[in-house]
Amino acid sequence: MSKMNYTLLCDFYELTMANGYFELNKGNEISYFDLFFRKVPDGGGFAIAAGLEQVIEYIKDLEFTDEDIKYLEHKKLFSKEFLEYLRTFRFTGDIYAVPEGTPVFPGEPLLTVRAPAVEAQFIETYLLLCLNHQSLIATKANRVVRAAQGRPVMEFGSRRAQGSDGAILGARAAYIGGCAATACTISDKNFGIPATGTMAHSWVQMFDTEYEAFESYCRLYPTNATLLVDTYDVLGSGIPNAIRAFDNVLKPLGIKKCGIRLDSGDITYLSKKARKMLDEAGYTECKIVVSNSLDETIIRDIILQGARIDVFGVGERLITAKSNPVFGGVYKLVAVEKSGTVVPKIKISENPEKITNPHFKKVYRIFEKETGTAIADLLCVHDEVIDESKPLELFDPVQTWKKKTVTNFFAKELLVPIFKNGECVYKSPDIDEIQKYCKEQIMTLWDEVKRFENPHKYYVDLSDKLWNIKNDLLMKRGRKE
């Protein structure tokens, strides 16, 4: 796949602001931005961070071509000096981020940028694009996977995705979230995600008889024979013809691995009937795969109804996150450097949830030592260190009277260095390692946090030092207004 030049994939105001910083001699002022989100999609208890690998690729390749400069000259908005500066533009700052697959919560940084103002401002759009999209799909996929209760979930959404990147990177994110495979072939080629597939109704229709279609497919792919049985009549012909094809082709070869797929109708009822027919024919190991506009709600319902399903194929409602299709990540200035000192900045809003947490920060995840269970996340000023040998008092940053003292704990920093002085210092894990890490980290959360409806709120608290800084800034801004 040839690389695209994504340098100008930015909101236009990133360029006008960058030009403004440059012209006003603010371009080299060191600034700090946090990328975070405010609400978990679908009212869930946590989200899954994804998309960092694409951020890394973008930052590494970031440069303006001659064609880019000519386009910007044509706009007649930018100074000649600024355009000349862009000819040698490279990212020279620092980036910290949570590893992909990490469960994350509202209000905490998924990524922090420290860089000259021009650079930090310009990269905003693409960073949000990467993390918003893939975190959304990884989060949705994980909900679907957890609803399936251990049954494999295949990502089947390419044809309903919103564009090619939506399909390719959506499959990547879905795999991080726990899907077992994808129907998107290029995602296998690019990322090593297992590609899988059965057949379409058109295959069956191309033959004079349904049986001929099934027999031919079994002969061509005897070790991968999953037959689509709902083209005409599932119980009357589809399953009987599948059994006949298995008898005549697979059984003589000693192959027991086979499957059928249901793509329409009452899949709970049909799966029960199909299981009975297959078992009576001796195909107790035959897998029943179902698709047909599934999501976590439908999957939970049909499992409760006793559906006999082994594998779920989930398409449009996963790849588009149909029930809540926006992640809502934002990118906000939190500090600047003045004479080598970090000066915190705050954004104030009439909506309390939109007031930002200022300063260059660390994010600690606090775990119980005995169980390894995550208790809370703690935002601290960058120079704070948690002493694990002493009791730690946590308090709700809004309802400050709610306090908890934890002992016998350990703390883990979530933000890790990705770029230092413009150089990548982080080695991205392969996709299987990311998926494994995601599963392991979700296991550290309380079951109550993982509820689909009305989950227990996982606390993201502020250290005393950070809370006091935030409160002082609020008071000062309030007096100025």
Where are these regions (language model features)?
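Gly/Ser/Thr/Ala-enriched C-terminal appendages of enzymes
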Residues: 1-29, 33, 38, 43-44, ...
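Buried, small/hydrophobic-residue-enriched core segments of structured protein domains
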Residues: 1-31, 39-41, 77, 83-105, ...
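Short, positively charged
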Residues: 75-83, 163, 390-398
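N-terminal, Lys/Arg-enriched amphipathic/low-complexity engagement segments
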Residues: 31-87
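Residue-level "edge-of-site" marker
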Residues: 201, 291, 315
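Hydrophobic residues within beta-strands of alpha/beta enzymes
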Residues: 196, 260, 288, 310-312
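Short coil/turn segments at secondary-structure boundaries
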Residues: 70-71, 139-143, 157, 450-457
